[in-house]
Amino acid sequence: MRNENEEMEKYFPHPLEKFKYCPVCGSSRFEVNNFKSKKCQDCGFTYYANPCSATAAFIINDKQEMLVVRRAKEPAKGTLDLPGGFVDMGETVEQGMLREIKEETDLDVKEIQYLFSSPNVYMYSGMGVHTLDMDFLVPVHGDVPAIKAADDAAEALWIPISEVNPAEFGLTSIRNAVIRFLQQYKIR
């Protein structure tokens, strides 16, 4: 996994490069301590750059269809995506997942099952944000209410799992998660 991170770093600067001043005392003597931290030479504060938590949902209905959304915003505007997003401060990953599903599809779900995670760099406002993406299986049973795309989803649609094409997903991290999901569950 470290080799993959080294490959990402060729294209995305380390997030600590953007931090020039100590967030505690404001000193400009905020220097690299090691790969994941900077230390203030004046007040001694050490800042660790940790990834942000993000989620993605594989929502599957009884007809073996996957709920996907079409991205309304950059990056990868107009391509397919999975419902999900960043976990807010004060939320658990599960709460963040449920909130994102509601925000993007207006779907209230009760059951989520953790699948897997992967490191990612998400481009936001010209800066690479290091994330830890956590993917969940979200089974929905019975009659599913009408789905309404909202928030940063332009459209929400059900696609038979057998017809899901990873190449249609615009974000590399999501595309890789879809491939992994399809392989792990022997759908392809």
Q: PLM features: what roles do these ranges have?
A:
Residues M1-K18, P145-R188:
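Nudix hydrolase/Nudix homology domain
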Residues E9-F12, N61-E103:
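Conserved Nudix-box catalytic region and its N-terminal flanking loop in Nudix hydrolases
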Residues P15-Y21, K36, S53:
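Short metal-coordination and nucleic-acid-contact micro-motifs, chiefly zinc-binding Cys/His arrays
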Residues C22-C25, C40-C43:
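Short cysteine-rich clusters marking metal-coordination/redox-active sites
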Residues F30-E31, Y48:
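Short functional micro-motifs and their immediate structural scaffolds
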Residues E31-S37:
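Short linker/helix segments within small regulatory modules
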Residues D42-M66, F86:
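Conserved N-terminal beta-strand and adjoining loop/helix that marks the start
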Residues F116-P145:
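Active-site-adjacent beta-strand/loop module that shapes the phosphate/pyrophosphate-binding cleft
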